[in-house]
């Protein structure tokens, strides 16, 4: 078998992402520092919630939480930002995005989620959380994508 691993850009977290190419198929390896491995479990639960609500998110292929990593499906190399930069007619893309935001708002979270032996409980989303995440947009996303 022919394997190739290439680091790819990540998100505003401490996770690292790598594209794994096995023959002609790709997947994503996500790793975290040892003390942050539980974040991988939360990441998996969030993706599972999104998928169960018909919102496209990576699917868990295999977990190696004890080794601070997991393998997820590869959704491709294009971000929403990349797509709207190259398109002339962006209206349909923005309409799709608004539909996704509406779907996100309709999700009713359970009190607890289970992933293997782990129980995950999401804290209540507060105005303070909103401000922190809004700051991420300016501090991380804009700096990263508008270089």
Model-identified regions with their sequence ranges:
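Hydrophobic residues at beta-strand termini and immediately following loops
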Residues: 8, 72, 137
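Short, surface-exposed acidic
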Residues: 3, 146-147
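ATP-binding pocket architecture of kinase catalytic cores
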Residues: 18-132
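ATP-binding glycine-rich phosphate-binding loop
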Residues: 3-21
